[in-house]
């Protein structure tokens, strides 16, 4: 499929400018320089006549990975607020909450991690193939895989630990993990002391979720909840890869926030085998 798309005869390879009336399908090849100049002039006309609010931009690229937010920065400089993207339907919560928590969207170090946690995610050989391959590579090295999914998915079938929680109870499960991690002092005390704020308030909130309550909410046995929490917290480098499953469920905001907290309190940020934080290209800002 990819070669067919790449080599398709109707694939756009050079800028084309419409000549004649709309719908006549008459086009003229022009240079990139001319195209950019004419686009800039048209944008200037729109801003001059209607203000920057008269412009809308649609993009399909992830602003944290593909374009380094250059499209958003471009609109910001113009003063245009109308940005449309599939990200708002796919990873909007994740992108916003992670940035608010620790400044950037974390990326898992699959090549060196010793534990992978999949919240409802089911990468397969022919679906999410790059992630699937990285999981398989990590598993071959001996990394543990924890799957949280009501279904017995393909990943769940070969997981080291499978928690068949009720749909939409991810946040409660995370609170249960934190309860085990705090009670057994499995958190990274140095990292928490240096980088985390509100720890006492967090611990007080977590204390409201003993494993009995979490088990009742999620439908998962207390011992299995505790086992999974220990595997994650004691791994020498662990990751919770992003998945759209979390973004598209009940209480997704709370669940994603708790994913962020789990990464932080276990010290799995910016370490080998953990999750790395990038940032904007310094040459762009």
Predicted regions and their residues:
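Flexible, glycine/charged-enriched surface loops at secondary-structure junctions
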Residues: 50-54, 187-192, 239, 270-277
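Conserved short loop/turn motifs at secondary-structure junctions
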Residues: 56-64, 217-220, 243-251, 282-283
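Scaffold signal of the M16-like zinc-metallopeptidase fold and its non-catalytic homologs
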Residues: 8-12, 179-209
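N-terminal export/assembly segments and adjacent metallocofactor-ligating motifs
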Residues: 1-184, 221
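Short acidic alpha-helix initiation/capping motifs at coil-to-helix transition points
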Residues: 15-16, 65-66, 202-209, 253
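Core structural elements
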Residues: 203-205, 226-237
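Conserved thiamine diphosphate
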Residues: 109-112, 116-122, 198-218
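A glycine-rich, hydrophobic/aromatic-adjacent loop/helix-cap motif
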Residues: 232-285
């Amino acid at each position: 499929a990819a070669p067919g798309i790449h080599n398709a005869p109707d694939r756009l390879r050079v800028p084309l400018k419409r000549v004649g009336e709309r719908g006549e399908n008459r086009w003229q090849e022009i240079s990139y320089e001319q195209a950019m100049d004419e686009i800039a002039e048209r944008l200037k006309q729109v801003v001059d006549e209607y203000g920057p609010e008269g412009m809308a931009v649609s993009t399909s690229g992830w602003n944290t990975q593909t374009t380094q937010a250059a499209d958003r920065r471009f609109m910001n400089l113009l003063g245009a607020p109308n940005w449309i993207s599939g990200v708002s339907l796919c990873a909007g919560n994740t992108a916003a909450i992670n940035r608010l928590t620790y400044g950037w969207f974390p990326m898992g170090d699959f090549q060196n991690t010793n534990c992978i946690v999949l919240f409802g995610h089911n990468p397969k050989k022919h679906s999410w193939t790059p992630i699937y391959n990285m999981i398989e590579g990590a598993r071959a090295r001996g990394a543990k895989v924890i799957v949280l999914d009501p279904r017995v998915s393909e990943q769940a079938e070969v997981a080291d630990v499978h928690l068949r929680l009720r749909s939409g109870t991810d946040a409660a499960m995370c609170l249960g993990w934190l309860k085990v991690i705090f009670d057994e002092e499995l958190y990274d005390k140095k990292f928490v002391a240096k980088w985390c704020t509100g720890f006492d308030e967090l611990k007080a909130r977590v204390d409201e979720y003993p494993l009995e309550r979490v088990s009742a909410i999620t439908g998962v046995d207390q011992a299995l909840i505790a086992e999974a929490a220990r595997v994650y917290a004691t791994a020498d480098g662990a990751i919770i890869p992003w998945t759209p499953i979390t973004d598209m469920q009940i209480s997704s905001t709370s669940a994603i926030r708790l994913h962020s907290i789990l990464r932080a309190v276990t010290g799995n940020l910016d370490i080998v085998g953990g999750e790395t934080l990038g940032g904007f290209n310094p040459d762009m800002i």
